[in-house]
Amino acid sequence: MAVLAALLRSGARSRSPLLRRLVQEIRYVERSYVSKPTLKEVVIVSATRTPIGSFLGSLSLLPATKLGSIAIQGAIEKAGIPKEEVKEAYMGNVLQGGEGQAPTRQAVLGAGLPISTPCTTINKVCASGMKAIMMASQSLMCGHQDVMVAGGMESMSNVPYVMNRGSTPYGGVKLEDLIVKDGLTDVYNKIHMGSCAENTAKKLNIARNEQDAYAINSYTRSKAAWEAGKFGNEVIPVTVTVKGQPDVVVKEDEEYKRVDFSKVPKLKTVFQKENGTVTAANASTLNDGAAALVLMTADAAKRLNVTPLARIVAFADAAVEPIDFPIAPVYAASMVLKDVGLKKEDIAMWEVNEAFSLVVLANIKMLEIDPQKVNINGGAVSLGHPIGMSGARIVGHLTHALKQGEYGLASICNGGGGASAMLIQKL
């Protein structure tokens, strides 16, 4: 060691080429070692969400940022920590037109967090809420922060119409719906997400009656879950104030009660008239809502004397051809399982976001997983799909629904051919 120390101290000119190379390699190894610290364990200490409102329904008077504030405040209160402990926040939000600058900043300050709290808004289309959790986890793992808030928010009821800037043409102007333009259209093939779902249904030979049956099952499961109190630990009430009228308190999801099973098989297909399979009943709906989780390192949980609900085990992103987005979660989920050395049989519960019934059926088919373990309390088809929120909602739901020691895997597709997946373990 004394010889090595002398070599490192000696001048470069006094060394032979061989010695110079040896010194460089020693310093490289030294540098590589110190740049790879042990990652910190990340735990979930609370997970809350607002009820999900129907399009132009019970929550339509509240912007996404207000819904986000309510979810964030609820999560911090459930965690039982001072707001000053939250060092940073990430929130998913897709349809930001007309919301004003920095939506996450609005949500965080609206929740009463300190002015000094850094905020970032994430847009990965429907995977935004989950990606926010993933990015917060990375920051916690590497020790950059020790307590964070992450989640997602969306108010599809408040998304504006737009027109192109420029001189007004003869004959009038054309307004475009930003829900469709920025949220539900495959920009590469210039088709609606539902047309992409039809393409996958054809490729995998998934018939309409299978999708209808799945949708009915989703509504049935959601109703049973609400009646059994399965959502009680995650949903916080929202008070809606209307000038000159009594306040309205929204306590439960609105969408799952708005179904007539007798009409499901009779509905016309939406995106493909001949031999189509996707209908308004077996697809998710347009909705409003927000979800938030308080994440922290295991060390921070000990310092703050809070009991973690679950730990984040692994996560991954994947991407396929844009038109094939419904099957992208298959690859993200497979990557997660491979990374941690688990088998699909080791997963007690799966949450596969129900953008369309087709998406879940395709993932069940390709992964060869037990349908009885998938979306056991319903999903986006029956509960609703506020697109920036859903990725956070399904992670939060697993956090409460799993039993101690069980693994749960949440996955969600996103426009452009992407997907995200996250594995958690109940503590």
UniProtKB/Swiss-Prot annotation:
CDD domains registered for this protein in UniProt: thiolase
Subcellular location: Mitochondrion
Family matches, as InterPro entries: Thiolase, Thiolase-like, Thiolase_acyl_enz_int_AS, Thiolase_AS, Thiolase_C, Thiolase_CS, Thiolase_N
Active site positions: 126 (acyl-thioester intermediate), 413 (proton donor/acceptor)
PTM statement from Swiss-Prot or TrEMBL: Succinylation at Lys-268, adjacent to a coenzyme A binding site. Desuccinylated by SIRT5.
Classification via SUPFAM superfamilies: Thiolase-like
Entry EC no(s): 2.3.1.9
Gene Ontology MF terms: acetyl-CoA C-acetyltransferase activity; C-acetyltransferase activity; cholesterol O-acyltransferase activity; coenzyme A binding; enzyme binding; identical protein binding; potassium ion binding
Binding site for K(+): 219, 280-281, 283, 381
N6-succinyllysine modified-residue sites: 66, 78, 174, 181, 190, 202, 223, 230, 243, 263, 266, 268
Main subcellular localisation: mitochondrion
Modified residues (N6-acetyllysine): 66, 174, 181, 190, 202, 223, 230, 251, 257, 263, 273, 338
Impact reported for residue 297 to M: In 3KTD; decreased protein abundance; decreased acetyl-CoA C-acyltransferase activity; less than 10% of the degradative/thiolase activity
Keywords of this entry: Acetylation, Acyltransferase, Disease variant, Fatty acid metabolism, Lipid metabolism, Metal-binding, Mitochondrion, Potassium, Transferase, Transit peptide
Superkingdom per UniProt: Eukaryota
Family per similarity comment: Belongs to the thiolase-like superfamily. Thiolase family.
UniProt disease link: 3-ketothiolase deficiency: An autosomal recessive inborn error of isoleucine catabolism characterized by intermittent ketoacidotic attacks associated with unconsciousness. Some patients die during an attack or are mentally retarded. Urinary excretion of 2-methyl-3-hydroxybutyric acid, 2-methylacetoacetic acid, triglylglycine, butanone is increased. It seems likely that the severity of this disease correlates better with the environmental or acquired factors than with the ACAT1 genotype.
NCBIfam families: AcCoA-C-Actrans
Protein name from the UniProt record: Acetyl-CoA acetyltransferase, mitochondrial
Record organism: Homo sapiens
Gene: ACAT1
